[in-house]
Amino acid sequence: MTARREASAPPRIAGHRFVRVLGLGGFADVFLYEQDMPRRAVAVKVLLAGSLHGDARTRFQTEANVMARLSHHPSIVTIHQAEIADDGRPYIVMEYCSGPGLAERYRRERISVEEALRIGVRLGSAVETAHRAGVLH
């Protein structure tokens, strides 16, 4: 069993106030920030310091560009900005989707067949949009 790591330090981002950690990933952490103008909650994905060199940084930049191109789809989060923090780590500011994720909902409640079909259609539509843009997931 692998020990869970601590979250990286959230970067200082002008016009944004750190709120809390949302999740930890293999090459990036995601934080909740409060944006000053316009006032709204945003999710900020930050590349880990250990991933600053080589392929991970290129993949991160590609992800930001691809997500921005796909943001017009209602089931794909909107990218607001992508920058480099003062500490040298790239970050992506994106729409924050509050509420439980699908995995958490599945563990806590029974999802009806009708709801599962609606979710499947929305997911399929998002994947189709990505495929039409040349993205394979």
Give each language-model segment a name.
Residues 19-25, 30:
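Protein kinase glycine-rich loop
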Residues 87-101, 105:
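Conserved short submotifs of the Hanks-type protein kinase catalytic core
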